[in-house]
Design a protein with these regions (language model features):
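Non-transmembrane "mature" sequence context
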Residues: 1-132
């Protein structure tokens, strides 16, 4: 298998894609899947206009934690949206998730340390996709 190929592992494909994609495209695709308001919430910015600027105007995030948050959000959003609709993916990010002690993935991404909450969120997404 050639480097970068992930065979039949959509979770690995989503990881590879979110890691290699330029940040501008990360923001644009997240907006397409989750909507600008939810992406702004995850990023921890006050206005959806800021994430629109990340996607369209070459604006860089002011806080260094924003890019890793949005890359992880894209990884999970792509993985879930390969199996469900955008609406289901949005609901998954906003809903109280029993795999996450009834906390929403969006809130964890916004407020948590990515190295702590990231593995929990990825595991919850895998459980959701496998379990429906």
């Amino acid at each position: 298998m050639a480097p970068g190929q992930t065979a039949s592992r959509p979770d690995l494909e989503a990881f590879d894609y979110a890691t290699r994609t330029p940040f501008k495209a990360v923001a644009k695709q997240l907006i397409d899947i989750l909507g600008a308001k939810l992406v702004a919430y995850i990023a921890g910015v006050r206005e959806a206009r800021a994430v629109q600027q990340y996607a369209h105007d070459n604006r860089s995030p002011r806080h260094p934690a924003i890019e890793p948050r949005l890359r992880l959000a894209l990884r999970v959003a792509r993985f879930i949206s390969q199996h469900d609709s955008k609406e289901i993916t949005q609901a998954w990010f906003m809903g109280l998730n029993p795999q996450l002690d009834d906390r929403s993935p969006a809130r964890l991404l916004r407020e948590g340390e990515i190295h702590e909450v990231g593995p929990e969120i990825v595991a919850a997404a895998r459980a959701f996709v496998v379990g429906g």
